[in-house]
């Protein structure tokens, strides 16, 4: 899939490439948050995945969906449909509300070879491409003992503190309070960090090109200090979690195909392995400073 219009990236130490029939400069304009993750020179290590992107024109008519619908994510800003394609491999369709097609993805059985068409204006194309890359990363990085999380992370005294919780619980707010009141604290990522169990058995958290509405795209990693799952409550209380709840707390924020038994089992195994190496807490807290 390598051609002259190929960009190489490395996130959490793991390489992937994005190619296009458009120019490199046009592709880069759709990927401003990836600037610090770009690798100028190709390396010999095998990429997690290779993605080819076609930027659809106004006259391009998308083909109808084929195959068996496996799962649908319907969230406030986006709909994602996962298909098993008739000839093997995977298909994903991404829509923005109200059901406007933003991207079509076709991927090999192991997700390592993929082709995407992205539609709409430049903002929609950039959003769709980011979602395609995030999904491919989450689905292939598991084999390298890495999990893409929905969380907010601060760095304090050389360690990363990962705030988890349901949407609206206050993950970003909690990070901002640390930045405001605790010296020597910096934001590492505000929406989608990567946590990786390293070959030496340590657990590190990495900044990524994906940080939600907060432009925090930092290419750096630190050892994990703790995972903290937040709950709004009438009292302030922090509790150290024990297995198996500690591992379940991690996977509760991880991205992946939960409906696929084999994939979900591997997610569970990695989550429990990570939980053995670091502290996992629940923090019940008042909605104030």
List the predicted regions and their residue ranges.
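A noncatalytic interaction/capping subdomain that flanks phosphate/NTP-handling catalytic cores
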Residues: 1-162, 167, 177-186, 194-289
